[in-house]
Amino acid sequence: MATEQIQHIAIVGCVHGKYREMYRQLSEYEKSTGKEISFVICTGDMQTLRYEADLVYLKVPPKYKQMGDFHLYYEGKEKAPYLTLFIGGNHESSNVLLHLYNGGFVCFNMYYLGVCSCININGLRIVGVSGIYKSFDEKKPYTYPPSPNDVVSLFHTRNYVIQMLSNLSQSSQIDISLSHDWPQGIVMKGNYKQLYRFQPGFKKDGASLGSPINKVILNTLKPKYWISGHMHCEYHAEEGPTHFIALGKIGYKNAISYLDLPLKQKTDLEYDKDWVCNLIMTWPAFSNKAQFPDLSYSISELLSKRTKELDKKIIELWEKYIGLKIIYDSDTFDIQFTSRRFYIEKIYNELNIN
């Protein structure tokens, strides 16, 4: 009987611009264990600062306004040794990430999953939800181009992501979901009494700790794993079929962990077909470049128009114009923003939806 192949996935909490330290620890782990890391998943606070002008969009106390390491990778002076998939947190160069709101490479080997999305790699379906929850911004559209006036709200999760993701588990199970904010209530599904001893400040929030948006997504998608950062501590919990893992921040021992999962097929990083169909079908709500989504549209209603015939046509057109394989794009982020929107609109128009 053939031995089952295993993929060894590194999962990381908050990076806070310490890329070299993260990759150093991952490399040392490989050397000490003899295990080869398949790819890396990070749960936010990446701080993708290209140059000092980006500091304007980084929402942190003044003493933490530092460039970090990312610019070295952006400039090509350093190269990420592993494919690194990440979502956004609440301490980000939010202007950079808004350009790539549908996802994209920020530099070689570092892929941002966007505001929300689903990608496939090595037979796994991975969902990402960026940002943290603030009730006063959950229905606020994004404005483009990004303005420093929006620095306090760009990283707040909008509730439309619930509808964008809600149907993704209908075709096959989601293997891993990522969020920066914990799903609300998940703290009560683990050893919260022990957690409170180490993090007494969490006790006052109790079951209300975390994002209600992420709670809905977790209960809808029911992924095998849900991985979060933000709270700078390690924590495990069980919610139905989902194993929840929270991690700390780089520089502390609880920042990195590993998942050993079956490798059924080795595949490149690809767009998830269901996600592609959702992206195209909801184009009317995102067609205004200056402000999106248009809340006069119902995301759920737009998605209800999906049919097998339309899905097939969407994937054919996506493969024709973009391709399912996600390829590193070295164009500037504003060009990527314009190019992606151009092709999404083109595909939608060719469907001739009434």
UniProtKB/Swiss-Prot annotation:
> Where in the sequence is the signal peptide annotated?
none
Q: Which residues bind a divalent metal cation 1?
A: 14, 16, 232
Co-factor note (free text): Binds 2 divalent metal cations per subunit.
Keyword annotations from UniProtKB, A to Z: Cytoplasm, Hydrolase, Iron, Manganese, Metal-binding, mRNA processing, RNA-binding, Zinc
> Major place of localization?
cytoplasm
- Compartments in which it is found: Cytoplasm, Perinuclear region
A Pfam family assignment? Metallophos
Residues the entry annotates as binding RNA = 59, 90-91, 134, 156, 201, 205, 230-232
Q: Give the CC-aspect GO terms.
A: nucleus; perinuclear region of cytoplasm
Q: What is this protein called?
A: Lariat debranching enzyme
Molecular function via GO: iron ion binding; manganese ion binding; RNA binding; RNA lariat debranching enzyme activity; zinc ion binding
Stated family:
Belongs to the lariat debranching enzyme family.
Q: Which residues cross the membrane?
A: none
- Residues the record lists as binding a divalent metal cation 2: 45, 90, 180, 230
The annotated region (Lariat recognition loop) lies at 130-158
One GO process term, biological-process aspect = RNA splicing, via transesterification reactions
Which cofactor(s) are needed, names only? Fe(2+); Zn(2+); Mn(2+)
Q: What is its EC number?
A: 3.1.4.-
Q: Which SUPFAM superfamilies match?
A: Metallo-dependent phosphatases (SSF56300)
Q: How is its activity regulated?
A: Active in presence of diverse metals including Fe(2+), Zn(2+) and Mn(2+). Binds two metal cations in two adjacent alpha and beta metal-binding pockets. The activity is the highest with Fe(2+) bound to the 2 metal-binding sites. The activity is slightly lower with Fe(2+) bound to the beta site and Zn(2+) to the alpha site and decreases further when only Zn(2+) is bound. No activity with Mn(2+). However, another study showed activity with Mn(2+) bound to the beta site and Zn(2+) to the alpha site. Mn(2+) appears unable to bind to the alpha site.
Question: What's the name of its gene?
Answer: DBR1
Isomerase keyword on record: no
General function of this protein = Cleaves the 2'-5' phosphodiester linkage at the branch point of excised lariat intron RNA and converts them into linear molecules that can be subsequently degraded, thereby facilitating ribonucleotide turnover.
Top-rank EC class of the record's enzyme: hydrolase
Q: Which InterPro entries does the record cross-reference, listed alphabetically?
A: Calcineurin-like_PHP_ApaH, Dbr1_CTD, Dbr1_N, Metallo-depent_PP-like
